[in-house]
Regions:
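Surface-exposed, low-complexity loop segments enriched in small/polar and acidic residues
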Residues: 1-89, 102-104, 110-128, 291-303, ...
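Short loop/turn motifs that connect adjacent beta-strands in outer-membrane beta-barrel proteins
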Residues: 9-19, 32-34, 97-103, 144, ...
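Outer-membrane beta-barrel transmembrane strands
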Residues: 1-35, 74-97, 104, 126-141, ...
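Outer-membrane beta-barrel transmembrane strand signature
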Residues: 1-8, 68-72, 77-79, 90-93, ...
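Solvent-exposed loop/turn elements at secondary-structure boundaries
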Residues: 118, 184-254, 271-308
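Conserved small/polar residues in nucleotide/adenosyl-binding loops
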Residues: 430-436
Length: 442
């Protein structure tokens, strides 16, 4: 993989300024050829005189068992794979301190081009190109007050020209209280106290299926299937099928996140980190599954319609202690609690409130409520009809489902949220380590 990198220090012009440029070309090729044979298997038997004779068990004759043996090596090729990637970036960095002030800035521009030699379809066989510009600007006063601004200005080939570029800024502030002069009297007990807050945006262009690479272009198959004409359909012609309709409005999936954090150190051995966050994802790509068939559409319709929220807290507790020159103890515990909720969902106006998924967890399961088992066939005949013909498709001893809407039959109208979300809301992890000069106990 050839790579070129150039570093230039520009302190002579502007103190603290430096430039870096790097580019590389990576090519990957793989193929496999195998030569093998199928062995013959023999069975030994003795005649009346005690002489042994061998008989081939898999020679392909009548009564042969297993894979037929071969006397030669066959030749087999696997699928070949060829990929290439071109990558380049340029970085301008500035760091300068004057008095108690420290300022920093970094700007990065990058381009990337990748190509697959055996993509499998037309759209994936085209070169994949992305560009991006990102930056970071920071200010630090006496290691007490810290402000930071980050941004990403990225371009994606997947969207139309007016939707292609996305700007995603992020702001952050932190206050290191333990570095204040008034904090000195309690530093032996509270060795560290820092609060921080961030608020920012992020974008995701890896949405939908890989086959739907260019949402703003129609995908038309000019040779979908053959249709016959004439006597006995003896004359055939290829037909045209639409696999995707062009959509100029599909764009980046966006997320907005706010974080509040606390860093607390006690006795220089114990450290507690607490982070509380809230994230809202919008423009989530979703299939429009509730479009009437009378519109005559042949391909599925997708749009940036859905919206979801997640929030939670992350807690980390670390303990590090040295006993003398040889003993050492370390402990770490983490706890995460997170919940999610659907805010906007592409669904029709139901009469039954229980059918809506808005307000439920992103991993909430929906289904039928199983009340109990039918006592006997008589109860089957006197209960709401469910999934077939009573007394024939289900009998006494089968599961009895609840008629939620009371219409006398079990249908999709009776599906409700059941059980807990499939994604755990709480997780914990604990580790410890005790080390002596000769032993390590975990």
């Amino acid at each position: 993989m050839p790579q070129i990198q150039i570093n230039q220090n520009l302190n002579a012009l502007i103190p603290g300024l430096s430039l870096t440029a790097m580019t590389y070309l990576k090519r990957y090729a793989y193929f496999e050829v195998s030569r093998k044979y199928n062995p013959f298997y023999y069975t030994a038997s003795a005649d009346a005189t005690g002489d042994l004779s061998l008989r081939v068990m898999n020679d392909g004759s009548l009564g042969s068992i297993g894979t037929v043996g071969t006397e030669y090596l066959d030749y087999s090729e696997s699928a070949k794979e060829v990929n290439s990637m071109f990558y380049a970036h340029a970085i301008a960095s500035y760091n300068h301190a004057f008095g108690k002030h420290n300022v920093g800035a970094t700007v990065i521009g990058l381009v990337q081009n990748s190509l697959s030699g055996n993509a499998g379809n037309l759209q994936l066989s085209l070169p994949s190109r992305n560009i991006g510009l990102s930056g970071r600007f920071s200010y630090n006063f006496d290691d007490r007050y810290i402000a930071e601004f980050n941004f990403g200005y990225n371009g994606s080939e997947r969207f139309a020209k007016n939707r292609r570029l996305g700007f995603f800024p992020c702001f952050g502030l932190s206050y290191n209280i333990s570095n204040e002069s008034f904090f000195e009297p309690v530093k032996d007990v509270i060795s560290k106290l820092k609060i921080r807050a961030t608020h920012g945006f992020a974008g995701n262009d890896q949405i939908g299926r890989s086959q739907d690479r260019f949402f703003y272009l129609s995908d038309v198959d000019m040779n979908a299937f053959q249709i016959g004409f004439g006597e006995l359909s003896g004359y055939t012609r290829p037909t045209i099928a639409i696999r995707r309709y062009a959509n100029q409005d599909i764009t980046w999936e966006r997320s907005r996140q706010t974080n509040l954090g606390l860093e607390l150190g006690l006795f220089k051995d114990l450290e507690l980190n607490v982070d509380v966050y809230k994230q809202i994802r919008s423009n989530i790509l979703t299939g429009r599954s509730y479009i009437p068939s009378t519109m005559g559409l042949r391909a599925a319709i997708v749009a940036n319609t859905n919206k979801a929220e997640s929030k939670g807290v992350d807690v980390t507790l670390n303990y590090n202690k040295n006993f003398g020159d040889s003993w050492y103890i370390q402990g770490r515990g983490t706890m995460t609690y997170a919940v999610s909720k659907k805010l906007i969902v592409d669904e029709p106006a139901y009469k039954e409130a229980s059918r809506y998924t808005v307000g439920t967890s992103a991993s909430q399961e929906f289904g039928y409520i199983a009340e109990r088992l039918f006592v006997d066939d008589q109860e089957v005949l006197n209960s709401p009809v469910q999934f077939g013909k009573p007394g024939l498709d289900y009998l006494g001893g089968d599961i009895k489902y609840r008629d939620v809407n009371g219409d006398g039959q079990i249908t999709d109208l009776d599906r409700v949220a059941i059980g807990y979300p499939t994604t755990p809301e709480r997780s914990e992890e604990h580790t410890s380590e005790l080390q002596s000069p000769d032993h390590l106990v975990c």
